[in-house]
Amino acid sequence: MSRTLEEYHAEIEPMMAEGDALAATRDPATVDLVKRRITDSVLVIAAYQMFVHREVFAPMLDGADATTRARVNELKIECIALTEDLRFNVRDFVGRMETAPLDWDLVAPKVAWFNGRVREHIAHVRAALAPDLSDADHARLRAYRTAMVGVQAA
C-alpha cells in the first residue's frame, strides 16, 4: 500500500518527540528501548528518503524553472545527508554499545541535533509544496500540528 507524505511525517514526528523525551529523562531503564527506537528510525528515515525523492521531489523537478530546480535539489541533498548522518551515527552508537554503557552526554545532543535537522527539513518540504502560504499560514499549520502531536514535533 502506498503511503503519503503526511503519513510519513505523522510517523516521524512522534518518533522524534519520543527520542527527545528519552534523551531528556536519561533513564538507564530505557537503554533497550533507545536502541530499538534508533534502529526503527533508520528504517523509517530510509523509507522516507526513497519515497520523498520519487513521489515529491521528482514531480517538483518535472518542468520546473531554474529557481525551483535549485531549491528542490537543496532539499534532495539535505534529505540524503540526513539519512547518511543517521546511518553513520547509528553505526557509531551500536559500536560503542557493545563495549560500554550508554553515554547519555554523547547521545542526547546528537538526538537533539538530528531531530532539529529533520524538523527543519520537513518544514522546508512543506513550504516548497505550499509556496503560496504566508508565514502566518505556515505558523498556524505548525501550531495545529503542535497541538496534535506535541511541541517537540512542530
Which ranges hold each PLM region?
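Small-residue-biased structural context
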Residues: 1-154
